[in-house]
């Protein structure tokens, strides 16, 4: 699972150099202010737990200024993924194929929005769409761009 946060105006706050020592409000503020410390991605501690439904899930930073924002305004300050996602296994499609590719699959159109709704409200409201390149599916070599939040 990947999520992205917006960028915006500078802040006058300081952030703990260890990613996990910051609360989600501070992480969101750093992203919004485009002031994500380099140490968050370089010191080996680029993960933090997030409480979802009473269970802690590990969230890892997998990119800084890597993904293009779908609205064309620049790069997403952070790209994160969830570790050990959920205890439930989900299919890409009910047919057990990748027909239709990522853009049209059940995982993207139904499952991901349902999973987003389980995230803490303060995080949900700061997730922004980015462009991701994916296969058109069904053994196609065509690459398509999708705008994704998760």
Where are these regions (language model features)?
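Collagenous Gly-X-Y triple-helix signature in extracellular proteins
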Residues: 3-150
């Amino acid at each position: 699972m990947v999520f992205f946060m917006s960028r915006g105006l500078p802040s006058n706050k300081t952030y703990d150099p260890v990613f996990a020592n910051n609360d989600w409000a501070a992480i969101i503020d750093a992203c919004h202010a485009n002031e994500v410390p380099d140490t968050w991605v370089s010191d080996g501690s680029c993960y933090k737990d997030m409480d979802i439904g009473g269970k802690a899930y590990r969230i890892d930073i997998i990119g800084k200024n890597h993904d293009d924002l779908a609205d064309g305004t620049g790069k997403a300050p952070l790209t994160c993924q969830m570790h050990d996602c959920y205890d439930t296994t989900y299919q890409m499609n009910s047919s057990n194929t990748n027909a239709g590719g990522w853009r049209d699959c059940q995982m993207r159109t139904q499952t991901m929005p349902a999973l987003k709704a389980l995230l803490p409200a303060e995080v949900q409201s700061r997730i922004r769409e980015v462009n991701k390149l994916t296969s058109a599916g069904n053994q196609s070599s065509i690459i398509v761009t999708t705008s994704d939040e998760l």
